[in-house]
Curated annotation (Swiss-Prot):
It comes from the Bacteria. It is an enzyme of class 5 (isomerase). SUPFAM superfamilies: Pseudouridine synthase, PUA domain-like. This is tRNA pseudouridine synthase B. GO terms for biological process: mRNA pseudouridine synthesis; tRNA pseudouridine synthesis. Pfam families: TruB_C (PF09142), TruB_C_2 (PF16198), TruB_N (PF01509). NCBIfam families: TruB. The active site is at residue 51. Keywords: Isomerase, tRNA processing.
Amino acid sequence: MGERSAPTRRVDPLGGLLVVDKDGGMTSHDVVARCRKILGTRKIGHAGTLDPMATGVLVLGVERATKLLGLLTLTTKAYTATIRLGSATTTDDAEGEVLTTVPAGHLGDAEVAAGVAALTGDIQQVPATVSAIKIGGERAYARHRAGEQVELAARPVTVSRFEVLARRDVAGFVDLDVVVECSSGTYVRALARDLGAALGVGGHLTALRRTRVGPFTLDHARTLDALADEPRLNLDMDEAVRIAFPHRAIDAREAESLRDGRWLDPVGIPGVYAALTADGTAIALLEEKGKRASPVFVVRPRGLVD
């Protein structure tokens, strides 16, 4: 039997970012596995995770751009979601077993608005039990599925926007379509749970769609089917760096120094930022400490593109 040929690589070694509009029912790892097949490379990783039930923005790094993932500032996220008031579940979403059912049709809009307002701003939130948080080296969701009683400590999170867009009264339940803008580490499922608890009727999430993570939005995203039909990156390395990081302009001499891993004089930009040539080519990501702006990642080291 002959050996199977390797899949044809569809991207250059420099790579870039793939912003996927994830379908429901897939894990983040499922998305990575399919993208590896479509693009013909194993050098793909994802920044953060998205629950299987959720749809929307998932950021993947391809080829050399996998090294960008740990440097991206993805601290703010935005979602649209549907919360059902009147029913609590074991997982705080529609995939769990129903714990309680309480009629919620009596709730007035003002009561709901007050409950939403109390969960907006800087709050302490107990993460969802079925979460990827590690307890003693094991994920909370794994312990929960093994039948263990999981208790997680409250954590500070910021919910900068929590707004009800529409309300529907359905068979004693109240379904709320909401938009949430929040810090990384915020669980929208937990917002649904806590809103229902505060209103005395229980609550859980029935739909979740991530519309933005950091600077990347649904406008940047493509579905896996679209990717399969036209295998290409959403953002090449230069585009990805320009969108994701502040930047400074450098001349040809400075570019050559950075390609060799040498440092430049600082210019006062905080955090990690990009060094771009006049034509927008990304050479390196820098961080300033003292009197040096040193590379934390050389995008185009000497020898890679020579």
